[in-house]
UniProtKB/Swiss-Prot annotation:
Its EC number is 7.5.2.7. It comes from the Bacteria. PANTHER family: CARBOHYDRATE TRANSPORT ATP-BINDING PROTEIN MG119-RELATED, D-ALLOSE IMPORT ATP-BINDING PROTEIN ALSA-RELATED. Part of the ABC transporter complex RbsABC involved in ribose import. Responsible for energy coupling to the transport system. It is a peripheral membrane protein. Keywords: ATP-binding, Cell membrane, Membrane, Nucleotide-binding, Repeat, Sugar transport, Translocase, Transport. It catalyses: D-ribose(out) + ATP + H2O = D-ribose(in) + ADP + phosphate + H(+). Pfam families: ABC_tran (PF00005). GO terms for molecular function: ABC-type D-ribose transporter activity; ATP binding; ATP hydrolysis activity. ATP binds at residues 35-42. Belongs to the ABC transporter superfamily. Ribose importer (TC 3.A.1.2.1) family. The gene is rbsA. This is Ribose import ATP-binding protein RbsA. Residues 3-239, 246-493 form the ABC transporter domain.
């Protein structure tokens, strides 16, 4: 299938989202669509699949002018969109998820389960996926759920699959599996639109790249004819001199220490510390127990055994409220479900953990609150028309900045960052890194969990590696390599 989008314009209210965007997709190619958060990538694909209607512009499919009125119609014509938030019903079986709304029944209305299972198995075999059709989809890993979505798309005879941040929550093994599947689909003439911020993946799997900036097409080129620096420059409109801004660490005393901490079934006998002004990176494969550790240290989950020491004093943290009072902040990996109130304003999200600062006598001083929020919006360069904009309407990078702003506002001594730049574009990433460095200069201790090895290597002073719920090693940043980290993460020595 060949797709041509020409001079596409789209406005939401007063906000011009797309201004004359053009995009072309050839049969059997993997085409990267890149741009900073808010550049208009998802809006463009939503117009293609009929979720939104363009104000102006032309869409041609195989040379014929074509417009879809809704995503289901696009799917019926062979175009499937796999969103970053997967469309999976966790309490239903794998089979039920595959055939939801497309069940096969006899003339008497009896479900033909055997026939559906045969068709499902046929698709899974094509994808080399081994998965029980009777298990609940919620029991599957994110990588397996993604394969369910791909199989679902292929069962509608999809010729084009749009993938939005497909590897954001995948393990290294699942990413390799996804790339194998994409390569096989490509050989069968299926085209892939690959929306991602992960530059390494773009250069590994894609044939061409279209770069967008501020709702416009900047360039379309063959991957073989460009490089990392050129793509970044076109995305952000300027050169980023360094991917990871340099800093000279000034390390103080231990401000946070964990001794022999365990939570049954999650992690065991964990001990580590972080000093003021230090960034400790926590690396490991997905499922190793890193997030579970951070949740327990912040009081979200209860420790079974172990001790927590803050500024040299043994303390107990029974819940997040106690953690905040004792100077801890926690930026969760799941910003949409746990980090933000999506249908609440930016102002309310940022002010929420800081309400006591604006209400010394029980009444909120709205002037002080507004000044505080405006200061943080400017400081973190959160792109918004108003502090009253609901968090739901922000791009991924700006949502993450709101989460960071609300925790910076409490003035933490120790800040836990769990996947701080997941789903964030390269420009916003660098802004977050710069902010982390500024916080350490003020003496804040940072614990950073990340699945991106370049980020771990580029930002950490020390690196703790977790394997199957235990700390398998600790490396100073000067001695760390990707190979050494991966060896420890997979149980090697």
């Amino acid at each position: 299938m060949q797709i041509e989008m020409k001079d596409i314009h789209k406005t939401f209210g007063k906000n011009q989202v797309l201004s004359g965007v053009s995009f072309q997709l050839m049969p059997g190619e993997v085409h990267a669509l890149m741009g900073e958060n808010g550049a208009g990538k998802s809006t463009l694909m939503n117009i293609l699949t009929g979720l939104h209607k363009a104000d102006k512009g032309q869409i041609s499919i195989n040379g014929n002018e074509t417009y879809f009125s809704n995503p289901k119609e696009a799917e019926q014509h062979g175009i499937a969109f796999i969103h970053q938030e997967l469309n999976i019903w966790p309490e239903m079986t794998v089979l039920e998820n595959l055939f939801i709304g497309k069940e096969i029944s006899s003339k008497l209305g009896v479900l033909q389960t055997r026939k559906m299972k045969a068709l499902a198995k046929e698709q899974f075999d094509k994808l080399s996926v081994s998965l029980s059709l009777d298990q609940e989809a919620g029991e599957c890993s994110v990588g397996q759920q993604q394969m369910i979505e791909i199989a679902k798309a292929l069962m509608t005879n999809a010729e084009v699959i749009i993938m939005d941040e497909p590897t954001a929550a995948l393990t290294e093994r699942e990413i390799s599996k996804l790339f194998e599947v994409i390569t096989a689909l490509k050989k069968n003439g299926v085209s892939i639109v690959y929306i991602s911020h992960r530059m390494e993946e773009i250069f590994a799997i894609c044939d061409r790249i279209t770069i967008m900036r501020d709702g416009k097409t900047v360039d379309t080129t063959n991957i073989s004819e460009t490089d990392f620096d050129e793509v970044v420059k076109k995305m952000v409109g300027r050169e980023l001199t360094e991917r990871y801004p340099k800093r000279t660490p000034s390390l103080g005393d231990k401000v946070f220490e964990v001794k022999n901490a365990s939570v049954k079934g999650s992690f065991e006998d964990v001990s580590f510390y972080v000093r003021s002004g230090e960034i400790v990176g926590v690396s490991g494969l997905m499922g190793a127990g890193r997030t579970e550790m951070m949740r327990a240290l912040f009081g979200v989950d209860r420790l079974d055994t172990g001790e927590i020491w803050i500024a040299g004093k043994k303390t107990a943290i029974k819940n997040p409220q106690e953690a905040v009072k004792k100077g801890l902040g926690f930026i969760t990996e799941n910003r949409k479900d746990e980090g933000l109130l999506l249908d609440t304003s930016i102002r309310e999200n940022i002010a929420l953990p800081n309400l006591s600062s604006f209400s010394p006598k029980g009444l909120i001083d709205h002037k002080r609150e507004a000044e505080f929020v405006d200061l943080l919006i400017k400081r973190l360069t959160i792109k918004t028309a108003s502090p009253e904009t609901h968090a739901r309407h922000l791009s991924g990078g700006n949502q993450q900045k709101v989460v960071i702003a609300k925790w910076i506002g409490i003035g933490p001594k120790v800040l836990i960052l769990d996947e701080p730049t997941r789903g964030v574009d390269v420009g916003a990433k660098r802004e977050i890194y710069t902010l982390m460095n500024e916080l350490t200069e003020r003496g804040v201790a940072i614990i950073m969990v990340s699945s991106e090895l370049p980020e771990i290597l580029g930002m950490s002073d020390r690196i703790i590696v977790v394997h199957e719920g235990r700390i398998s090693g600790e490396i100073h940043a000067r001695e760390a390599t990707q190979e050494r980290i991966m060896t420890l993460a997979t149980g090697g020595r």
